[in-house]
């Protein structure tokens, strides 16, 4: 009966459906794949055909039929579905499967205003032809289905209203490289472009959403993370809100430091008025964050930071929970609570914590970040001064409230500000780190603005990327990859536009980069080691030592060629201090691996030539971009062998890499047991990583007799993280018993970092 059905062609003509042609396309897509059945895909699709069906609907039906068959037993359907999608998308973009010549493609899209016109000005036709001959369009067939759907939904240059798509993946990769290396000398730039194209299109380097979707278009803002500090004045609060709007509209995730704002009831103008407290201003920031969608890709998101000893802390800790009324809740932002050794020692010793308004205790707020001994002396002095207004709470009660809110919302984060400043690339006396970003992996200096155009203030930006550990055969491969990624991201800093002077000045002076990793869980499985039992400690130490060493080396080489960053003198590197000198020595008790690289020679080179970049590493979450590389997310263990991600492009199934061979080696999140092994690994990584790490804590209430996670356990893990030098804690995940056991882990999309922000 199917023979009689008609199909409506793209040009509107009707003809009899050609099942043989459909068979040929599916057979082509199945070539070389393991355990997939062409006839099963055909059968599943045929049932859904109807008379007059359009060519597009036929294609989409076949793709969906293949995607529905993805499972643990038959993981290769993810490649069959992907190849069918690639075929379909190329037809949509080019009218045929074969891509056009690169030069013609770029000329057309520049003419349409979709690509940046500098591409036609910077490169000759002959150069485009040389690059075109180098492109390998067959690499499109290495994507998984989840990757193609992400490319289609988020990354390809398109008209988001009419859903027209204008390009395919290999053009995306080569043009990102061409934009970044456009100002390099003609004699070397094509070589860099080809090498960077190879590294990114074979998934060795993973690029963040803002770069993948934005570089080659006329909108030039690609920093994933923006850190804005607010002062304790109305002018500064207004400047902060305006800065938020400016950056949220350009695809960035925001970290806001609101810790200086004075507490409720504090005096204003010597008592002429009393202060309304933090909450009305947090609401103002929330409105600013939510007023724009991020470049049409997703809604804005922010994390707000404040110290545990802030006078209003008990009202601030509950802002996200579901109790309370609209007036005393600000639920649509996340919060980062700042701690240090003095706060922890009050907890351990069963003491009290005194809460102050920062405006009542001169010098205390700055000392909290700049100098721990000075902070403690001032804190005790103010506690003993009866003229200073304060509230006293039992440390255990305050910490319990903090951990209870972290557990119930999952989104109250932790920043250990002493670790962020003692084990930092920056000299804390001149450039203290006073906040983090949306996802807690960035630790950069900021200064409050007095108005939006103020260039005395400092807005920190971080430009991200990651190494795919699963695609690296030996650690020395990192030497070339580090050179490529440092050169590309450093060039990006000069290539992009800066909406605000405070951001431009800070970035030009510090030139901060954050290179992380993806596919760590696959890397452990491939090497036969686990999160939980310490077997991965040595490998992790060797790997992260190599990453930091090669990135620093690449930045020194670039400094020799293009000069050190102007604020190099504000770094600890300028004093000859390296991460291996300042890390928390407690970590040596869980990992005895020696250093394998020549750090002393590197130290001398840095002292002599400086660094091009003040920071080089940050370990970010990578939900979206790890799907492109078919990798596991960041440093996280997978929740299931098949993850089912709900996104606006429908349900995406993704199977962990090399599942059939490594099934027994993967350790799933809820099989790990305690957080100890994971936190030890994060501590080992943090020894080398110069910024911070988005590290999560995970709890399964069903393993405890009461069915609840004891407070004692939550506090123990918090102290373990502190002990081993962990700078920040991101999500608190609680197992809710949803489908995890069946190997399929269903993940709902997150409203914040989903798709970029300061994830990659």
Task: Locate each region found by the language model.
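Catalytic alpha/beta core of large soluble enzyme barrels
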Residues: 124-150, 440-446, 489, 493-494, ...
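A glycine-rich phosphate-binding loop feature that marks nucleotide/adenosyl-phosphate handling sites
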Residues: 44-45, 63-65, 79-87, 199, ...
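Internal maturation/activation junctions in enzymes
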Residues: 482-504, 508, 529-622, 693-694
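Core nucleic-acid recognition elements
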Residues: 1-3, 13, 36-174, 178, ...
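Function-dense linear segments that define catalytic or interfacial modules
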Residues: 157, 171-189, 193, 197-223, ...
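Gly/Pro-rich turn-and-neighbor structural signature
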Residues: 164-235, 375-405, 409-414, 544-604
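Terminal amphipathic helices with adjacent charged low-complexity linkers/tails
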Residues: 77-110, 149, 339, 420-450, ...
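Polar, glycine-rich mid-to-C-terminal structural blocks
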Residues: 318, 327, 331-409
């Amino acid at each position: 009966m199917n023979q009689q059905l008609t199909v409506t062609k793209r040009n509107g003509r009707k003809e009899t459906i050609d099942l043989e042609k459909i068979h040929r396309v599916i057979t082509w897509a199945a070539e070389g794949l393991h355990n997939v059945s062409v006839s099963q895909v055909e059968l599943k699709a045929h049932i859904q055909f109807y008379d007059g069906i359009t060519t597009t609907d036929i294609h989409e039906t076949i793709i969906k039929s293949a995607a529905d068959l993805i499972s643990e037993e038959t993981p290769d359907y993810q490649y069959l579905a992907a190849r069918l999608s690639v075929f379909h998308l190329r037809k949509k973009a080019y009218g045929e499967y074969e891509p056009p010549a690169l030069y013609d493609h770029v000329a057309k899209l520049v003419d349409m205003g979709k690509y940046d016109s500098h591409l036609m000005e910077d490169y000759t036709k002959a150069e485009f032809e040389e690059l075109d001959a180098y492109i390998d369009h067959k690499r499109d067939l290495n994507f998984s289905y989840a990757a193609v759907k992400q490319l289609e939904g988020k990354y390809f240059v398109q008209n988001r209203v009419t859903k027209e798509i204008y390009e395919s993946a290999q053009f995306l990769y080569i043009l990102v490289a061409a934009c970044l290396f456009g100002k390099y000398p003609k004699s070397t730039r094509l070589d860099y472009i080809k090498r960077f194209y190879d590294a990114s299109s074979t998934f060795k380097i993973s690029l963040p959403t803002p770069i993948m979707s934005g570089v080659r278009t006329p909108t030039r803002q690609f920093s994933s993370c923006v850190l804005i500090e607010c002062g304790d004045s109305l002018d500064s609060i207004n400047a902060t809100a305006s800065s938020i709007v400016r950056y949220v509209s350009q695809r960035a995730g925001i970290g806001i430091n609101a810790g200086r704002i004075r507490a409720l009831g504090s005096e204003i103008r010597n008592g002429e008025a009393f202060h309304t407290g933090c909450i009305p201003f947090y609401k103002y920031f929330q409105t600013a964050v939510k007023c724009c969608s991020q470049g049409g890709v997703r809604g804005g998101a922010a994390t707000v930071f404040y110290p545990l000893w802030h006078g209003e802390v008990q009202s601030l800790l509950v802002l996200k929970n579901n109790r309370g009324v609209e007036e005393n809740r600000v639920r649509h932002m996340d919060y980062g609570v700042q701690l240090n050794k003095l706060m922890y020692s009050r907890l351990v010793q069963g003491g009290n914590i005194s809460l102050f308004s920062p405006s009542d205790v001169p010098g205390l707020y700055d000392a909290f970040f700049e100098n721990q001994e000075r902070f403690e002396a001032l804190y005790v002095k103010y506690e003993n001064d009866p003229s200073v207004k304060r509230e006293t709470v039992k440390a255990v009660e305050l910490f319990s409230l903090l951990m209870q809110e972290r557990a119930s919302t999952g989104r109250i984060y932790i920043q250990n500000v002493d670790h962020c400043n003692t084990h930092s690339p920056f000299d804390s006396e001149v450039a203290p780190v006073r906040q983090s970003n949306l996802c807690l992996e960035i630790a950069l200096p900021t200064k409050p603005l007095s108005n939006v155009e103020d260039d005395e203030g400092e807005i920190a930006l971080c430009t991200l990327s990651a190494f795919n550990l699963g695609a690296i055969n030996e650690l020395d491969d990192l030497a070339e990859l580090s050179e490529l990624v440092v050169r590309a991201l450093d060039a990006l800093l000069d290539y992009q536009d800066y909406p605000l002077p405070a951001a431009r000045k800070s970035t030009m002076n510090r030139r901060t980069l954050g290179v992380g990793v993806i596919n760590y869980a696959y890397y452990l499985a491939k090497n036969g080691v686990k999160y939980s039992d310490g077997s991965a400690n040595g490998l992790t130490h060797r790997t992260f030592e190599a990453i930091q060493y090669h990135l620093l080396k690449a930045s020194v080489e670039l400094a020799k060629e293009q000069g050190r960053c102007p604020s190099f003198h504000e770094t600890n590197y300028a004093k000859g201090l390296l991460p291996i000198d300042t890390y928390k020595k407690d970590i040596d008790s869980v990992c005895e691996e020696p250093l394998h690289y020549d750090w002393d020679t590197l130290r001398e080179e840095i002292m002599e030539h400086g660094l091009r970049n003040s920071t080089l590493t940050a370990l970010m979450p990578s939900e979206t971009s790890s799907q492109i590389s078919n990798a596991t997310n960041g440093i996280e263990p997978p929740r299931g062998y098949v993850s089912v991600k709900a996104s606006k492009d429908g349900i995406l199934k993704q199977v962990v890499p090399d599942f059939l061979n490594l099934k027994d080696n993967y350790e799933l999140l809820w099989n790990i047991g305690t957080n100890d092994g994971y936190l030890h690994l994060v501590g080992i990584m943090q020894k080398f990583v110069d910024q911070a790490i988005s590290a999560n804590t995970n709890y399964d209430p069903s393993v405890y007799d009461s069915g609840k996670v004891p407070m004692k356990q939550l506090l123990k893990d918090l102290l373990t993280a502190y002990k081993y030098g962990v700078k920040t804690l991101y999500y608190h995940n609680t197992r809710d018993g949803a489908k995890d056991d069946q190997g399929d882990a269903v993940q709902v999309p997150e409203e914040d970092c989903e798709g970029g922000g300061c994830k990659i």
